[in-house]
Design a protein with these regions (language model features):
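Feature for soluble, non-membrane regions of globular proteins
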Residues: 1-213
Length: 213
């Protein structure tokens, strides 16, 4: 029997082909990650909140409302993982059209807060490698400073009231098909070859625009 429970959330389509991130992320890896793992979080979230008051809220509102609730931990985990993955896909851009340069305003902030772009990249990779077990590594704006944040499991900056600019998924399902247990190689490849720096810069610029409004 087909369920009639409302499904307020949907799996976002990728803005690029499954093969577009090759040779750094294979079509097989991306399809498994997006179509199976991400979809499972969306389906579970809909099952948990469909037809409830939470189901009428935005994803960000659900995350903030459930972040500190032990009773709603499962809802938080699935809502946050849906948000995290949706953001992660946008952090990457097809290799054939990628502009490897970092926009000037963003580069200025990175150099100011980390010393150099290379130092930032090294710290980002180190934080991801050092994340014990499953989680995410983020570039965030905390106050007026850029910082790197590693979060466990589904946790994210939205739940902590911080602005996410960039993320990399360090759950094994994000890289195991292509990199097996070589998380350092995956992280270095991500930061050197896959990041859409224009998207990262736009996240920072959007915050400034909001403040000026």
């Amino acid at each position: 029997m087909t369920s009639t429970k409302p499904a307020p959330f949907t799996l976002p389509e990728l803005s690029y082909e499954e093969s577009a991130l090759a040779p750094y992320i294979s079509a097989e890896q991306l399809k498994l990650h997006h179509d199976k793992h991400h979809k499972a979080y969306v389906d579970k979230l809909n099952d948990l909140v469909g037809g409830t008051a939470l189901g009428k809220k935005s994803l960000e509102e659900i995350i903030k409302a459930t972040a500190k609730s032990k009773a709603k931990k499962t809802i938080f985990n699935n809502a946050a993982q849906h948000w995290n993955h949706s953001f992660f896909w946008k952090c990457m851009t097809p290799t054939r059209s990628r502009d490897a340069s970092i926009p000037d305003a963003l580069e200025h902030r990175i150099v100011r807060d980390f010393g150099s772009v290379d130092a930032f990249k090294e710290e980002f990779v180190k934080a991801g490698v050092g994340q014990f077990g499953s989680g995410w590594v983020w570039l965030i704006e905390d106050g007026d400073k850029l910082a790197i944040l590693a979060t466990h499991d589904a946790d994210n900056p939205v739940a902590q009231g911080k602005l996410p600019l960039l993320t990399c998924d360090v759950w094994e399902h994000a890289y195991y098909v292509d990199y097996q247990n070589r998380r350092p190689d995956f992280l270095k490849t991500f930061i050197d070859h896959l990041v859409d720096w224009s998207f990262v810069a736009a996240n920072l610029a959007e915050k400034k625009s909001d403040l000026a409004a």
